[in-house]
């Protein structure tokens, strides 16, 4: 970070955070009356009742719903285009992403393509994308059931182009969620290995954002607190997934790390992992980051010594007047 930083801060998302706060969905002012609810192709949203709880809260708010349930762990362009076409045909006026980062990222991309012509990759600014400007998008509501991506508080969405084998992040001011509800009670069913992978994703959002050249005073505050919370509470959440205090602390750390992404940036570690999981879509994103991390951070050890020391200081002070 520069000695005399100049920066701007723009996070237009309303955040509702806390155990049991999913109930606020029935009373919040919502951006429309017909929603496409986007979930993964897995079983957990229905098995644990999360989908029905969200649909019930939306009904109480006089919102009609459709469910799109094909999203993969590494979401693909084909599904974005298919769901966007459904949005247009059914005249949905906002999109709800319910689940992990893949569902919420997909909801953001669907919201873009519901309002813009052409192909999704026309708007992506990397690889074979054409970088067309996005002029409008449907409003987005994010309801995470995992703690890792922080996508509920940033504009970024990561989608895979299967044919080109490209996995690229994209975002703009229009892809910030309008409303995000982070309820740690929706996260207690995550199995230990996924809790760990997702927690490390949040850790690397914070650590990368802290060493990035574009780090800001506000992103530093978010990053260091996220690192402290993850170091202290991720082992607890992995060992005991029903521990709501640990789940809440990791959920807050993930949200903070998402705010790091909105006020600083991930570094090339994330880009390297995106290339890995574009070729190997079964690879969990967090696991790929873990595999890269030792060699990656060793490479920058001498360039970021003071920043590394500050992160270490936050970790070694665990237990000293911190909660």
Protein language model annotation of sequence segments:
Residues 13, 19-20, 39-41, 71, ...:
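Fold-independent oxyanion-binding glycine-rich loops
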Residues 78-185:
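Glycine/threonine-rich beta-strand-loop-alpha-helix active-site module
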Residues 279-282, 286-320:
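Gly/Pro-rich interdomain helix-loop hinge
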Residues 156-264:
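Carboxylate- and glycine-rich phosphate/diphosphate-binding segment that chelates Mg2+/Mn2+
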Residues 148, 255-286:
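Glycine-rich phosphate/pyrophosphate-binding beta-alpha loops
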Residues 1-94:
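ATP/NTP phosphate-donor binding region
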């Amino acid at each position: 970070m520069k000695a005399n930083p100049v920066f701007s801060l723009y996070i237009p998302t309303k955040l509702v955070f806390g155990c049991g706060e999913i109930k606020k969905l029935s009373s919040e002012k919502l951006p429309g009356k017909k929603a496409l609810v986007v979930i993964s192709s897995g079983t957990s949203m229905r098995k644990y009742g999360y989908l029905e709880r969200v649909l019930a809260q939306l009904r109480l708010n006089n919102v009609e719903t459709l469910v799109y349930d094909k999203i993969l762990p590494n979401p693909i362009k084909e599904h974005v285009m298919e769901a966007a076409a459904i949005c247009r045909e059914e005249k949905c006026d906002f999109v709800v992403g319910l689940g992990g980062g893949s569902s919420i990222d997909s909801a953001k991309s669907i919201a873009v393509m519901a309002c813009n012509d052409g192909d999704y990759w026309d708007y992506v600014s990397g690889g074979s994308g054409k970088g067309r400007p996005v002029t409008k998008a449907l409003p987005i509501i994010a309801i995470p059931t995992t703690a890792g991506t922080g996508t509920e508080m940033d504009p970024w969405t990561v989608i895979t182009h299967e044919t080109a084998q490209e996995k690229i992040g994209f975002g703009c001011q229009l892809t910030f969620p309008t409303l995000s509800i982070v309820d740690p009670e929706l996260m207690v069913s995550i199995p230990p290995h996924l809790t760990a992978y997702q927690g490390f994703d949040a850790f690397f959002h914070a650590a990368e954002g802290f060493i990035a050249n574009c780090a800001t005073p506000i992103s530093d505050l978010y990053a260091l607190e996220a690192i402290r919370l993850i170091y202290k509470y991720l082992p607890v959440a992995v060992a005991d997934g029903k521990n709501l205090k640990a789940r809440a602390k990791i959920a807050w750390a993930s949200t903070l790390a998402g705010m790091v992404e909105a006020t600083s940036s991930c570094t090339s570690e994330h880009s390297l992992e995106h290339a890995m999981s574009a070729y190997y879509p079964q690879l969990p994103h967090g696991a790929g980051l873990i595999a890269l991390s030792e060699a990656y951070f060793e490479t920058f050890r001498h360039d970021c010594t003071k920043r590394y020391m500050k992160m270490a200081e936050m970790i070694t002070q665990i237990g000293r007047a911190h909660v």
